[in-house]
């Protein structure tokens, strides 16, 4: 159940609205539901929030359809089951099965005011764990641009089992949930970023520049340019020179 009383929840939501934060926030009430009763609990939690703030956005992450009930194994049924309770549907890329048509199906299920996001975790490729190459880290956002997600979620950036001594969680793939490191282990009092995070940043910058390129020359032209380095989640360049050429081309066309 929610940790706040009704009065506390109402006060928090009113304060968020008054300070202009409510339209920037989303409520993450459940992680990766798989069963019918879990969807019902999401509806209950969402109803409680919407009682005091009908405009509040609730985000739900999921990587599969229900594992029970009449919609068993139907990924796209989640959009119908949670209609009204969720405004941001965030699918794990594992559920998309390297099939861009499934991304199109997700977008087609959206109703007015709803958004479709995606997330990577575990050993997804392209992704952010250590099994992805540096270009794979970058291609995470190339994929987002091509498949037209309106948001990207990553579950945690400092998911250590312990900090003293510094240890990752043994049940997770190497690098999953760890994008930054405490500086003490590396002789500094500042946070240290991973190379994987820096390459993801490059991809996020590419994404922003592709959007600017699209506004100037059209989406078809932007996709044609992206196609030089990225065709699908299982078919993208492994040569950094082509990634750099993409960046150079984007900058030249945006600024001329």
Regions found by a protein language model. Name each.
Residues 1-2, 7-38, 42, 46-65, ...:
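Catalytic domains of carbohydrate-active enzymes that cleave complex glycans
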Residues 1-163:
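Catalytic-core regions of glycoside hydrolase
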């Amino acid at each position: 159940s929610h940790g706040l009383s009704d009065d506390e929840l109402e006060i928090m939501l009113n304060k968020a609205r008054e300070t202009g934060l409510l339209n920037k926030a989303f409520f993450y009430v459940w992680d990766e539901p798989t069963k019918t009763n879990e969807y019902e609990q999401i509806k209950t939690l969402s109803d409680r929030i919407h009682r005091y703030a009908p405009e509040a956005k609730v985000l739900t992450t999921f990587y599969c359809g229900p594992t029970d009930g009449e919609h068993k194994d139907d990924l796209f049924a989640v959009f119908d089951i949670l209609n009204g309770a969720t405004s941001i549907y965030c699918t794990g890329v594992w559920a998309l099965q390297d099939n861009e048509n499934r991304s199109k199906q997700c977008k087609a299920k959206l109703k007015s005011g709803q958004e479709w996001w995606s997330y990577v975790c575990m050993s997804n490729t392209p992704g952010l764990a250590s099994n992805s190459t540096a270009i794979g880290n970058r291609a995470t956002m190339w994929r987002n641009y091509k498949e037209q997600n309106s948001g990207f979620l990553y579950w945690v950036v400092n998911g250590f089992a312990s900090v003293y001594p510094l240890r990752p969680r043994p049940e997770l793939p190497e690098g999953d949930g760890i994008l930054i490191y405490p500086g003490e282990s590396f002789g500094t009092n500042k946070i240290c970023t991973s190379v994987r995070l820096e390459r993801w940043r490059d991809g996020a910058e590419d994404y922003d520049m592709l959007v600017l390129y699209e506004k100037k020359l059209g989406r078809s032209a932007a996709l044609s340019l992206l196609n030089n380095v990225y065709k699908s989640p299982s078919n993208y360049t492994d040569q950094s020179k082509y990634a750099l050429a993409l960046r150079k081309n984007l900058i030249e066309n945006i600024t001329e």
